[in-house]
């Protein structure tokens, strides 16, 4: 926030953007097997989306002794809440900015800078969980 206040004080242009579902833009590496176990209503929803999932439904007994339907799916993209997702998103973000000629600030990895036509351009990012 202090950066935005300082930039406004200096008369710099400021723009804000949001990346909806940011973590979903990053892919899990091929050597990682992240398996998601879906049960109950989620299996019904998945089968409604694609009937082929019906062939992959398995039945298990839960801790209460009740038989429940389960669907195991391999996660291909980073999922919000997975430990590695934040890292994968940051890696994608920083690599993309580097390819565009921005330099990641070594003291604050959430800031990237680039000089274009003698003007400094700064990208600052943060995670908003609201």
Predicted regions: what they are:
Residues 1-130:
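Long, low-complexity, charge-biased intrinsically disordered regions
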